[in-house]
């Protein structure tokens, strides 16, 4: 008899099941734990002053966001943005902080906020479209931060940051409407990936990797190539699954299926087996990410300008994936 399709996760079905995330760092050959230290004290003081002003004037949270949350975000960005110089790191830090606040404090509650429908639409449009930024103060401030990236990246790469941001906002808001979610207990990983990779911020990996490269950019023909998209797929899959793995404990009592471990748990009738399978997928996608880089670099060995550009971008991407792994592993936000 075929298993009944489910659209919700019910923890009662897995009562008394014990589970544990096994250590697997040694199997991620190529990952290195690094966090910036050079200008950390200076940045941290500026950062806390900025978060205070944002809370008071823009988010109107009046200091209700615990200081430890900002400390966690600061540490998280220290891992992921380790390759950045001082000034672009400041912008990356503000951008990531604002994104997490939007995700955790605004998008998470957007359907329950005491806002009229047209006010919600203005807020969303102000975050997605530059020409609508004046419709909402939050959107205006967000665009002020995004525009600072222009000082540290090529104009073509900057446009890709904007595109990734718009896609993330749309996907992040849409994913919270469980009743319209096409994700169900029979989803394969690729089906799940298609629905979740954008709202999980995966599109930022390769765009952020281009920050700091002012004099060159990756041509669209390369970006759109099968070889490049394969790298992008494995990087985004790694990010999505790492996020699912280390946020599962926090999300276990929520009944949505916005975590692949929940889908696997229903399929396998075991949380532990679903965690083990997720770890296998993480390792597989990371190793394929590395091998796919080798494949595309071989294609451009006779074009040193493109070769060196791609090599730099992929080195930055690998540092970002390393940061994602160690930040998730150690952060209280994901445990």
UniProtKB/Swiss-Prot annotation:
Q: Which GO terms describe its molecular function?
A: (3R)-(E)-nerolidol synthase activity; metal ion binding
Identify the Pfam families for this entry: Terpene_syn_C_2 (PF19086)
What drives induction of this protein's expression?
Expression is almost undetectable in vegetatively growing cells and increases during development induced by starvation. Expression is highest during he ultimate stage of mature fruiting body (approximately 24 hours after induction).
Q: Does the keyword Isomerase apply?
A: no
Domain topic, free-text comment: Contains several highly conserved motifs that are important for catalytic activity including the aspartate-rich 'DDxx(x)D/E' motif and the 'NDxxSxxxD/E' motif, both of which are involved in complexing metal ions to coordinate the binding of the isoprenyl diphosphate substrate in the active site.
User: Which family, according to UniProt?
Assistant: Belongs to the terpene synthase family.
Q: What is this protein called?
A: Terpene synthase 4
């Amino acid at each position: 008899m075929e298993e009944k399709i489910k659209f919700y996760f019910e923890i009662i079905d897995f009562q008394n099941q014990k589970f544990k995330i096994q250590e697997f760092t040694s199997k991620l050959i190529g990952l290195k734990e690094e966090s910036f230290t050079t200008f950390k004290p200076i940045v941290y003081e500026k950062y806390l002053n900025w978060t205070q002003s944002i809370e008071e004037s823009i988010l109107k949270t009046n200091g209700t966001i615990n200081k430890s949350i900002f400390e966690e975000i600061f540490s998280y960005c220290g891992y992921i943005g380790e390759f950045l110089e001082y000034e672009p790191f400041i912008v990356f830090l503000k951008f990531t902080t604002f994104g997490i606040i939007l995700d955790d404090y605004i998008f998470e509650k957007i359907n329950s906020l005491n806002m009229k429908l047209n006010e919600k639409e203005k807020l969303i449009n102000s975050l997605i479209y530059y020409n609508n930024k004046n419709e909402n103060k939050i959107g205006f401030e967000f665009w002020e931060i995004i525009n600072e990236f222009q000082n540290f990246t090529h104009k073509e790469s900057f446009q890709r940051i904007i595109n990734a941001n718009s896609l993330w906002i749309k996907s992040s808001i849409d994913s919270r409407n469980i009743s319209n979610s096409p994700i169900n207990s029979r989803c394969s990983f690729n089906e799940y990936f298609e629905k979740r990779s954008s709202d999980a911020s995966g599109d930022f990996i390769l765009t952020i990797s281009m920050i700091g490269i002012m004099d060159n950019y990756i041509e669209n023909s390369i970006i759109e190539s099968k070889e490049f998209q394969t790298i992008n797929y494995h990087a985004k899959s790694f990010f999505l699954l790492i996020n699912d793995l280390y946020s599962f404990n926090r999300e276990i009592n929520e009944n949505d299926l916005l975590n692949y471990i929940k889908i696997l748990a229903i399929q396998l009738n075991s949380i532990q087996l679903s965690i083990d399978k997720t770890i296998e997928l993480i390792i597989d996608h990371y190793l394929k990410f590395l091998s796919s880089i080798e494949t595309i670099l071989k294609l451009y060995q006779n074009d040193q300008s493109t070769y060196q550009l791609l090599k730099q971008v992929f080195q930055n991407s690998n540092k970002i994936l390393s940061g994602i792994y160690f930040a998730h592993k150690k952060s209280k936000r994901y445990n």
